[in-house]
């Protein structure tokens, strides 16, 4: 009986889809130390630099379902591994 129970537990663990959750940096500073666990469907980390005026950059980092659109005076980098948007 114990063997059957143990077998059922092992099969249940193996068959469960534990899933994978992506972790991305999420803060507006140049040097970032805050992390965000991405929601279901968000499979991309991004870093967006926006030049507001000469010598003034705004950093935006986070999770996304798709790579954000690049607009004038923006630079966007996308990646798909943990904490890759440094």
Swiss-Prot record:
One of its GO terms (cellular component) is extracellular region. It is found in: Secreted. Disulfide bonds join 24-45, 27-32, 38-63, 67-78, 79-84. InterPro entries: Snake_3FTx (IPR003571), Snake_toxin-like_sf (IPR045860), Snake_toxin_con_site (IPR018354), Toxin_cobra-type (IPR054131). Expressed by the venom gland. Keywords: Acetylcholine receptor inhibiting toxin, Disulfide bond, Ion channel impairing toxin, Neurotoxin, Postsynaptic neurotoxin, Secreted, Signal, Toxin. SUPFAM superfamilies: Snake toxin-like. Residues 1-21 form the signal peptide. GO terms for molecular function: acetylcholine receptor inhibitor activity; ion channel regulator activity; toxin activity. It comes from the Eukaryota. Binds with low affinity to muscular (alpha-1-beta-1-delta-epsilon/CHRNA1-CHRNB1-CHRND-CHRNE) and very low affinity to neuronal (alpha-7/CHRNA7) nicotinic acetylcholine receptor (nAChR). Belongs to the three-finger toxin family. Ancestral subfamily. Orphan group II sub-subfamily. This is Probable weak neurotoxin NNAM2.
């Amino acid at each position: 009986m114990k063997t059957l129970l143990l077998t059922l537990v092992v099969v249940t663990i193996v068959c469960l889809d534990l899933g994978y959750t992506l972790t991305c940096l999420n803060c507006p500073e140049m040097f970032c130390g805050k992390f965000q666990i991405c929601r279901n469907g968000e499979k991309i980390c991004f870093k967006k630099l926006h030049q507001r005026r000469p010598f003034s950059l705004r950093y935006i980092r986070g999770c996304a379902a798709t790579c954000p659109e690049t607009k004038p005076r923006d630079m966007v980098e996308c990646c798909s591994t943990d904490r890759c948007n440094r």
